[in-house]
């Protein structure tokens, strides 16, 4: 019995001495992969994408001076140009707004030269976009010309200025006055455009 007590005492001492040993270093073990701080697992549909870096917004105006205009946003990169606004109207409406040259800007106004390939001479696209449906050449011509005029005036008038003070002149290829034989109307090349100032030629 005395021997058994001695053996139990020795075993207890050995166990206690083992508990005092330093823990083995974890430095040599394989690293445990962890999620990067702040990362979140993707699930479901992504949120609406942010606008392109450096993108800016301009406004397109579609309609007529007589009936009013609807406004549509257009995103663009870099410097805003008259050609970019006119192309924006074309992309939005489906109308062919091919130009015969660059828009010429001068003191107090801009000169827009339309190509013979433009919708003003070839008609609206087929099929037309329902939102921009026009009835006949007269409706198309007034809407097209007024929309370009209004969009350029609003786009290039400084804050606090009067958009109507920015005159817009129209001409066609060959630096000829704008004339629409199908409607019997023309506009003098040396006078700013106003739909109601058309000269009746037919």
Which ranges hold each PLM region?
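Bimodal "functional hotspot" detector
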Residues: 5-8, 18-202
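Bacterial Sec-type N-terminal signal peptides, specifically the leucine/valine-rich hydrophobic h-region
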Residues: 13-16
